[in-house]
Regions:
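Polyanionic/metal-chelating signatures
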Residues: 142-280, 413, 419, 431, ...
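Beta-sheet ligand-binding and adhesion/scaffold domains
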Residues: 95, 441-450, 480-553
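Histidine-rich, glycine-flanked metal-binding segment
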Residues: 22-24, 29-36, 44, 48-90, ...
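Tryptophan-anchored aromatic micro-motifs
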Residues: 39-43, 428-452, 457-466, 474, ...
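N-terminal helix-cap/turn-to-beta initiation motif at the start of protein domains
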Residues: 30-37, 73, 426-439, 452-455, ...
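His/Asp/Glu-enriched, well-ordered alpha-helical/loop segment
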Residues: 33, 41, 111-122, 133, ...
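C-terminal cap of metal-dependent C-N hydrolases
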Residues: 42, 397-430, 572, 912-952
Length: 991
């Protein structure tokens, strides 16, 4: 019987699948036999939650012919007994590049300098990161080794895309079988359109930031839907983009914040994305749930952190350690919140880690049926392929794998995988060799011999009735066994050579004796030798230490978001910035996020009373020029104008500098684009609502602003050879950039008015807003001639420059600035840090103020922003500005420059309760902010901060010690990796 079974299996493995008549010629006789097989009496997981016992599966011509009990065996059909096996539908990976790695990016022929345009031959898009015309199926070639690895982890189908660029082209749905030609493995040629926020491998200068990538993607959408083309240009990329609009869109992002950014783009164009996320969605689960968009999540959970040095506490952040503990809980949290998701193997160091990581997710709360659904039915549904894959049902591809136990039993092993009906034995799985005592029998010998076999055996001894009969050499590896008997060691001269493999508990195989006679043999397990320590480890449930999510997910975050309170400050010195001036021994009441009133001897039922005797209360500090809380680049310097990019697209609510600046009394900031080009990007106005999501930091109904720049930075004087080919290269050229764009902006306004359906140009849209007084300029500036030039350009085109920032030669042209109506946001005492500021003086702010220009002091620096109160004090030192007026330099005046003074900047009933409690005169170097409120919510408290610092150290120590124990217990670990902190300035460029 065993000979017949073994022969049947051998024949089965030699057959090929016949789907249809092939156009490819044969090299030798063709095998016309159909690949038909019956799997009997298995436990079949037809679909997640639908388990059928003692069930048969009939496979014909690569598809499932029938599923049920006692199915009649067709003539000539092979039959396999699976009575002790579990069968699962093959997994589907929706984010893979399997088989399409032969695609190559454009090789640049350009020498030094910036690469401004695509070098791809043909009528394609101007930017190499945009290649929707790429079809992954044209590059697909099956890879035997990788396919075997994927099958070994349960994957029978992948959706393969070119993982390079912003618009990556169409993805192809393929099976992980092995056939020639590879086209026979293609299930569906064009299934989805791949997108991302990463420019990929191109060395083209634009985009150089994530906000640039987002702007480029948005512009591509508008190019695709334009009803009237601006020229008769033939563009194959845009044509392909329009074709791809009928496909599913899969966008790859790298954090939960980027998920929200992707959703923002999708909503703008009425699209639904499938978002390949980063596995950190638990950090803001409510916001992710509100997007109502499906996810593809990785399970590349970080290894536990192993710490050998107490100094490691200073090298690693609390959020890093917390992520290690919480990442395995992410799939379960998503499932419990009803968020639709599928799971990808992307991001794993090795594919063989997949099942281990999946079981870890199950241990940490992911329901088993939900886990299976995330790998079968959900991905099939998301790409509209439920008729072909995802379950074990009649008519679908015969894609399923066989386990010797329930998949979620940690001791379970996969024995085989059927892909499009073809059976693949698995040779790359963890060895399931049985160590133990066996009985050896053959078809040509009636005797049964006792033998001990282990993986470490080098010799084999066959014992009959306690007497050594045969001995020889043996090798056991990956469930395969080979042994031969040495004639010299044989007592009767017999020579046997045997090969076989493990099937369940026993070994079966074929052999040949010294006479050339073939036979079958069996090694029947009598007694298994078990490694108890290994089994105990497999059975043990190792859970990550419990820890809580913080908002934001950094060390100084809160477990719960704070709320607005009714607070009465008693007996304080109030700096009103109003006609009342500075009031001593005065009370102030805030409630519902607003200033209610101030006066003497106030009382209010239910109010929290704070004794502010000897202390000062002011409106919050406003930083007119900041670069904190920005993700992935502050400059988009690849072109002379980047008016299309928006800082608001990349606001980073997790930046610890928000908290640090709250500790310095800052409550609002203008987040500015850098100064890499004459026309920069659009600003974002935020309040420092520590812990709020990015969109909730934004100040609603704030006017739009945009960054312009003059001087050394924009003409790239310090960029070296890399910056010698982008226009402009001189100060004269900078003026011509403005002349060009404003004249084009005027024409654009007229054309759009005449033809509202013409192509929308995001760059010129922003320029048009400036000309229509809907967007306002903040201009980086130093030298008086350039300052005067931009005001003249503005006068010519009938708009007003809103603010000159830095403006270190403003004292030279203060009268002209006042006449133009422009404000100044300057440094208090910066000079001599580059040549174009050679004439800077610390009296600059006072001189402009005395002439009548609205003057503010800004930071342009994450550290200086925490000391803007001291910067204001320097206006008193340099120029004798009265204290009350000097304080306005960092409160009311920046509010005026940002058009926010109706809501903030002073203590006035009805204004936002953005207030700071200071320990001393706020202009003093001894003053510290004791409490900072934004919209009446206390986001910083110096006394509570001391407690937080101690709590952070204790929590880091607790988690590290717990992980040290897990590492000692055998769990994979890695050393401490310090997190790099990036601080942006005007001239910062992403690497």
């Amino acid at each position: 019987m065993h000979f017949r079974l073994f022969y049947t299996i051998i024949c089965f493995l030699l057959t090929t699948v016949t789907f249809a008549q092939s156009t490819f010629p044969n090299n030798g006789p063709a095998d016309p036999r159909p690949n038909n097989v019956m799997l009997r009496r298995a436990t079949v997981v037809v679909a997640p939650g639908n388990v059928q016992t003692s069930t048969d599966i009939l496979v014909e011509k690569g598809r499932i012919k029938a599923v049920g009990k006692n199915i009649a065996l067709p003539q000539g059909c092979q039959e396999i007994d699976c009575s002790d096996k579990w069968i699962y539908s093959s997994f589907i990976d929706l984010y893979s590049n399997y088989g399409v790695t032969s695609w190559q990016p454009i090789k640049s022929n350009q020498g030094r300098g910036q690469k401004l345009l695509s070098e791809k031959p043909g009528a394609y898009y101007w930017n190499e990161s945009i290649h929707p015309e790429t079809n992954a199926f044209e590059y697909f070639v099956s890879d035997e080794k990788e396919a075997n690895n994927l099958r070994g982890q349960g994957f029978g189908v992948t959706l393969s895309q070119i993982k390079d660029g912003i618009s990556r082209g169409s993805a192809v749905l393929v099976s992980t079988g092995e056939k020639t030609p590879s086209s026979n493995l293609i299930i569906d040629e064009r299934v989805a359109h791949g997108l991302s926020f990463s420019k990929g491998s191109t060395n083209q200068s634009y985009p150089s930031s994530q906000m640039g990538s987002i702007a480029l993607l948005r512009q591509l959408y508008y190019d695709g839907i334009a009803q009237d083309k601006p020229t008769d240009e033939k563009n194959l990329s845009i044509e392909a983009w329009r074709t791809n609009a009928n496909l599913k869109s899969i966008i790859a992002v790298n954090s939960w914040q980027e998920v929200l950014r992707a959703v923002k783009v999708a909503k703008e164009f009425n699209k639904t994305y499938i978002v390949k996320s980063a596995g950190d969605e638990y950090q803001r689960i409510d916001a992710i749930k509100a997007t109502n968009m499906p996810l593809i999540i990785p399970i590349n959970f970080p290894e536990v952190v192993k710490s050998d040095d107490i100094l490691d506490l200073d090298k690693i952040s609390l959020e890093q350690i917390k992520h290690v503990a919480l990442a395995p809980r992410n799939p379960g949290i998503l499932s419990q919140n009803g968020i639709k998701f599928t799971i990808t193997s992307d991001g794993l160091k090795e594919i063989k880690e997949f099942r281990e990581k999946l079981l870890l997710a199950v241990d940490h709360g992911l329901d088993k049926d939900k886990a299976l659904a995330a790998l079968t039915t959900v991905p099939a549904e998301l790409i509209g392929e439920t008729a072909q894959i995802g379950t074990i049902e009649t008519g679908k591809w015969a894609n399923f794998f066989v386990m010797d136990k329930n998949y979620f039993d940690k001791k379970a092993k996969m024995t085989s995988h059927f892909v499009q009906g073809r059976k693949y034995e698995l040779y790359n799985l963890p060895d399931s060799t049985r160590d133990g005592k066996f009985l050896f029998s053959t078809s040509i010998d009636n005797d049964k011999y006792s033998v001990h076999i282990t993986k470490s055996n080098k010799e084999i001894n066959l014992v009959y009735q306690d007497t050594l009969k045969y001995k020889g050499i043996i090798s056991v590896n990956n469930n395969k066994i080979n042994f031969s008997l040495d004639p010299k060691g044989s007592l009767d001269g017999k020579y046997w050579s045997c090969s076989g493999r493990l099937d369940g508990k026993n070994y079966y195989g074929i052999g040949q004796n010294q006479e050339g006679t073939s036979f079958t043999w069996t090694l029947t397990l009598v007694e298994e030798i078990r490694d108890k320590k290994k089994e105990e480890k497999a059975d043990s449930l190792i859970l990550m230490p419990e820890t809580k999510v913080l908002y934001p997910f950094v060390g100084f975050g809160n477990e719960k978001m704070p709320v607005a309170e009714k607070v009465l400050f008693k007996n304080a010195t109030l700096w009103t910035n109003e006609a009342d001036g500075i009031l001593k021994e005065t009370d102030i009441l805030i409630e519902n996020g607003k200033i209610v009133r101030y006066g003497k001897n106030l009382s209010e039922a239910g109010a929290k009373v704070i004794d502010a005797t000897g202390k000062h209360v002011t409106s919050g500090v406003i930083d007119e020029h900041s670069h904190i809380a920005i993700s992935s680049g502050v400059n988009e310097g690849g072109q002379e104008s980047s008016a299309e990019v928006r800082i608001g697209d990349v606001v980073n609510s997790e930046d610890v500098n928000i908290y640090r600046q709250l500790s310095g009394g800052v409550t609002a900031s203008q987040l500015l684009h850098g100064s890499a080009n004459p026309i920069g990007g659009q600003s974002a106005m935020i309040k420092l609502r520590w812990g709020a999501a990015p969109q909730d930091l934004m100040i609603k109904d704030a006017d739009g602003f945009i960054k312009f720049a003059l001087g050394e930075n924009v003409k790239q004087v310090n960029w070296g050879i890399q910056g010698r080919n982008r226009y402009p290269q001189s100060r004269m050229g900078v003026e011509q950039v403005y002349e060009d764009y404003f004249s084009r902006g005027q024409a654009y306004i007229a054309d759009r008015k005449a033809n509202p359906n013409m192509r929308k140009d995001l760059d010129l849209e922003a320029i048009a807003e400036i000309l229509q007084a809907k967007r306002f300029i903040t201009c980086h500036s130093y030298q008086q001639g350039e300052i005067n030039m931009l005001m003249k350009v503005a006068d010519k085109y009938k708009f007003r420059v809103n603010t000159f920032t830095h403006i270190l030669e403003g004292y030279k042209v203060a009268d002209k600035m006042k006449a133009h109506g422009v404000g100044a946001s300057t440094f208090s005492d910066w000079w001599a840090y580059k040549y174009e500021v050679i004439d800077a003086i610390p009296y600059n702010g006072a001189i402009m103020h005395n002439v009548g220009v609205v003057v503010a002091f800004n930071s342009d620096d994450a550290e200086m922003a925490r000391r803007l109160n001291q910067e204001a004090g320097k206006a008193v030192l340099y120029g004798g500005v009265p204290e009350e007026e000097a304080w306005k330099f960092v409160t009311l005046n920046p509010a005026k420059l940002l058009h926010l003074d109706s809501h903030m900047g002073s203590l006035k009933a009805g204004k936002d309760a953005d207030i700071v409690l200071w320990s001393d005169n706020p202009l003093s170097i001894y003053a510290v902010a004791e409490q900072t409120y934004v919209d009446g919510i206390k986001y910083f408290d110096r006394a509570e901060d001391k407690i937080k610092q101690a709590t952070i150290a204790q929590e880091k120590m607790r988690l590290l010690r717990a992980m040290d124990k897990m590492s000692a217990g055998g769990m994979k670990s890695e050393g401490v990796r310090p997190k790099r902190e990036v601080l942006y300035h005007c001239d910062s460029e992403e690497e």
